[in-house]
């Protein structure tokens, strides 16, 4: 029996609150059950040095966890003087996922940075970050259209992400922390709205998984992501 009696292909309750903070061009609080992430998108009228003169924009991301997002206090990375490898890996994943749905040429020579700050962690923080960041980015792009900076929104669609895994011999979708910490196989899947893959990160924590189990997990991820995309569309329509 899963936590909260969820079916194996059922995601947690998803809540997307737009315009959550005052100043960011796009601001979203996303909740995957008890996992809560604040995603703020900022537009800057410049690009990184390697893109100067290329007539295109850039989308990047930063990721962090508040000290008491977890069961016990985690020291701020700023206090340590450097980012951890996990943090850098996750923020690069978020940025790659977002760029998959943006026409960077249409964005022009400007940069959008999406800051994803985990307020509370109960598994799936990177997948919640990607899903919420997409909505925040969409809102930021719409503001560029509304103020006349851009003629059309340069986003080509929506992107979302979900965790899947094998827990107690069963393939399940959208793992909570308790499930994640006991998973025999743990996988994060990123897809665009039509089901095409952006990234798959999968690891066997114990017993290796079979090719058939991989296909089962990818199918489960597609079912979960379709639920997330529907939640994104519903939020953007409000």
UniProtKB/Swiss-Prot annotation:
It is an enzyme of class 2 (transferase). Gene3D superfamilies: GHMP Kinase, N-terminal domain. Keywords: Nucleotidyltransferase, RNA-binding, rRNA processing, Transferase, tRNA processing, tRNA-binding. Phosphate binds at residues 86, 124-126. Phosphorolytic 3'-5' exoribonuclease that plays an important role in tRNA 3'-end maturation. Removes nucleotide residues following the 3'-CCA terminus of tRNAs; can also add nucleotides to the ends of RNA molecules by using nucleoside diphosphates as substrates, but this may not be physiologically important. Probably plays a role in initiation of 16S rRNA degradation (leading to ribosome degradation) during starvation. Homohexameric ring arranged as a trimer of dimers. NCBIfam families: RNasePH (TIGR01966). This is Ribonuclease PH. It comes from Mannheimia haemolytica. The gene is rph.
